[in-house]
């Protein structure tokens, strides 16, 4: 790294990555859960989580001065990896023994047919009743790749407050929440990610967020009321107190 980062973790000494990767050819790429992974010949892999920002740099472009890893190719182009808050960049040969890496691979993805209502309700039943809906959705990688950024629109579309206890959800609300997890994540994926994030080439995602740093000052898209922004469980939450009640509406 040109700029050491206190909260960027490597599974080898950073100086060893040169020897581990030099001479290998990129053969593919994969994404699962919170990880993206570059695949090289010889079984070598470079994986990084959602706290790492990779950026493709063309041959004629100037390299940034600060980065945590610079991967240069023989044609003069490169990928620069930077970390804002925290992240991990790991080089391995299929033997990476990391809890979140394993969960990202082994857990059932919300983008698959296997993630049905029955499985979702099993997940709900497996956690403590007093757990909040945000904690259920965004911690422990129960749903690979679903984090704080994605859950904002899921909860808004479901009409559920992020601080609601799991035990307070009715069967109807559980069904709606499952459907919105599936629908919102599928839409985000198809549209190239959220507009609050950038892709490998520096372009923002095509999914227009409803509840995010881009929209919270504009008011609720459903009722026009004020959107609340506050810190909760290690990250900002955005919600409409009118549309997302702390308890189910009685009909």
Regions found by a protein language model. Name each.
Residues 61-65, 114, 127, 144:
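Short, amphipathic alpha-helical segments
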Residues 87-128:
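A short, charged helix-loop
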